[in-house]
């Protein structure tokens, strides 16, 4: 695959993370770009179509469409799966 694209929301989420978490997320984004199905897990129910990768207490939420990975949000696990825009 290729480097994941980030939505405006995901870029903003990334900028607000603590430095150590941001570094771990960037490493995970590299892995997602290589093997997105292996790094994350497919979500079900109302979040069907999204994938989620764990990074400590944070979750990287993304979609895989036509070989392109689009990161939609990077949120703390307590709020990652709540209704809202992903």
What are these regions (language model features)?
Residues 1-4, 9-23, 63-86:
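Enriched for short, Lys/Arg-rich terminal
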Residues 29:
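Hydrophobic "lid"/C-terminal helical patch
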Residues 32-37:
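Short proline/glycine- and basic residue-enriched helix-capping loop/turn segments at helix->loop/beta transitions
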Residues 39-81:
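Basic/aromatic recognition patch in beta-strand/loop cores that engages polyanionic ligands
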């Amino acid at each position: 695959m290729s480097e994941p694209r980030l939505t405006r929301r995901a870029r903003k989420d990334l900028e607000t993370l603590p430095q150590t978490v941001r570094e771990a997320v960037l490493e995970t984004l590299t892995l997602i770009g290589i093997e997105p199905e292996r790094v994350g897990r497919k979500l079900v129910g109302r979040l069907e179509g999204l994938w989620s990768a764990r990074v400590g207490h944070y979750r990287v939420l993304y979609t895989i469409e036509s070989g392109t990975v689009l990161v939609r949000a990077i949120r703390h696990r307590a709020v990652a799966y709540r209704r809202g825009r992903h």
